[in-house]
Each structure stands twice: as C-alpha cells, then as structure tokens.
C-alpha cells in the first residue's frame, strides 16, 4: 500500500522505496544517500517544516548503517499533523550522508550524535565533531562490531 508521501514522490518522478507503515500508521520511505538532500529540500517545500527527530542505528554487524528522519507537517488548525519517516542506508566503509542542518536547524545536535556514536559523516554540517565522547576517543561505540576498550578511568569525585 502506498502512502500520500510516496504517491507524491512517484507523481514527481523522485526515486524512493516505500517500506510500509509503522504501528502508528506513519509512512516509512527509503531514500538513496545521493538523493537525500534534494528530497529533503522538496519535502520542506511540500510542507514538512518540522524535523521531529533524527537518529541512526547499525542494521547488522558488518552491514549497513541507517540514518532515520521523522518529519512532520505543522499547520495551523490541524489536530493530526501528517508525518513521514525517511531512512537513508549507507555502507559502513564510507558512511556519508548530506547534512540537512541548513534545512532544519534541529538536525544540528542529532546529526552530531549520530556521527559520534556510529561514525556517519554528514557532509556540509557546520560543526561535524564529537558531541558526547572526547575528541581523542577511538571508534564508534554504538556499532555492533565495536570492541570496547578494557580500561576504565576512575576520577576522583572531590
């Protein structure tokens, strides 16, 4: 079954893949990394003016990484806003996705956290650096193939 967003993208000949609907009825779409920025701009113009959340996850050990965007159309007088979930899959060998910071400013910390935890680099992000881990940290802690260091630094609480 095709949702409104997928039908709109098909009508305008924009490449995507429908992944169905989640348990709340939110349509989920898969977009290629090279198409993501243009589809993000088009989505904003179409009315998806609010980036509810951005997250990322490791699909499988040694497999793909995914960056997930939850977009919402906020309109005056609408009780149930239209939502869409967009997933962008990238290979772990070169995980690069265009940043949407310049479209939705709320992507700032969220993309940085995805970089910090999974190593997905967001091209054209103004401050693409670690946000939670120290800059000297080696590796990406939320990857399924991450090997945790066997040391723990204890700090004096006083």
From Swiss-Prot:
Role description: NDH shuttles electrons from NAD(P)H:plastoquinone, via FMN and iron-sulfur (Fe-S) centers, to quinones in the photosynthetic chain and possibly in a chloroplast respiratory chain. The immediate electron acceptor for the enzyme in this species is believed to be plastoquinone. Couples the redox reaction to proton translocation, and thus conserves the redox energy in a proton gradient.
Biological source species: Nymphaea alba
One Gene Ontology biological process: photosynthesis, light reaction
An annotated Gene Ontology molecular function: NADH dehydrogenase (ubiquinone) activity
Subunit structure: NDH is composed of at least 16 different subunits, 5 of which are encoded in the nucleus.
Entries under SUPFAM superfamilies matching the protein: Nqo5-like (SSF143243)
GO cellular component, one term: chloroplast thylakoid membrane
The reaction(s) this protein catalyses: a plastoquinone + NADH + (n+1) H(+)(in) = a plastoquinol + NAD(+) + n H(+)(out); a plastoquinone + NADPH + (n+1) H(+)(in) = a plastoquinol + NADP(+) + n H(+)(out)
Keywords: Chloroplast, Membrane, NAD, NADP, Plastid, Plastoquinone, Quinone, Thylakoid, Translocase, Transport
Subcellular location: Plastid, Chloroplast thylakoid membrane
EC assignment: 7.1.1.-
Gene it is expressed from: ndhJ
Record membrane topology: Peripheral membrane protein
Family named by the database record: Belongs to the complex I 30 kDa subunit family.
PANTHER family recorded: NADH DEHYDROGENASE [UBIQUINONE] IRON-SULFUR PROTEIN 3, MITOCHONDRIAL (PTHR10884:SF14), NADH DEHYDROGENASE UBIQUINONE IRON-SULFUR PROTEIN 3 (PTHR10884)
Protein name (database record): NAD(P)H-quinone oxidoreductase subunit J, chloroplastic
Enzyme class: translocase
